[in-house]
């Protein structure tokens, strides 16, 4: 399922999948809030202008209008930065989109610490917020293969779907000929004994980097990818944890309420489990700067992650 290291990236996969969806389904409406080139929307406005709507720099309007057109039979895919989709327009996401059965897709780009602009544009709490919305679907894709398939799946999912978006040249980790995304499903990327690593989104990319370092060091371990944080298959995650002495979660998110919170809840519900270490953004504001700098300052670079896991082996 995992491709060899150093695969060429995929340029603007969101642009390709949205034009594909619009051509196959005239009810799909691609929406944005004055961020068209920054969320990789290029082909739809030119080729399917009646299926594109830019509401201007007004994220609350973006989601409330999206909810409104869903009642007229459209399938909105509303795009903006994750910080705006979650923090600025959360009330509209919950009340307008989240309380009905109609499909409403919200895609938040530059999630977590992937923005260099510090807290103004970083979104390290969006997964925790959206996980708490009743009946919502929450997806954090790892690469171009998964992101493309998840967008396709989202337009057939009833109710609110919140997904983190990937833009620009997006990494390719998963083999598109072998990988099949399914909402809720988990994916074992490395089987083994010893410490277990559970990751999601960009955290899975970082976990794969650390896993390769651990392999070179002869450290046995296992790696589970959890792209859907809600609805998650708790039993699959529990089976992965069961029988291990240590489990680590790795995520591009605050350690409160995201993947680490999900795994902790599963263990608590079952009354035990291995010792859990949550690796992500600690309970303080992340710095600004390049992604490499931010990761290293938070102990999320491959070497730091591998060292922490190796010490527990």
Model-derived segments and spans:
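Thiamine diphosphate
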Residues: 1-164, 169-170, 180, ...
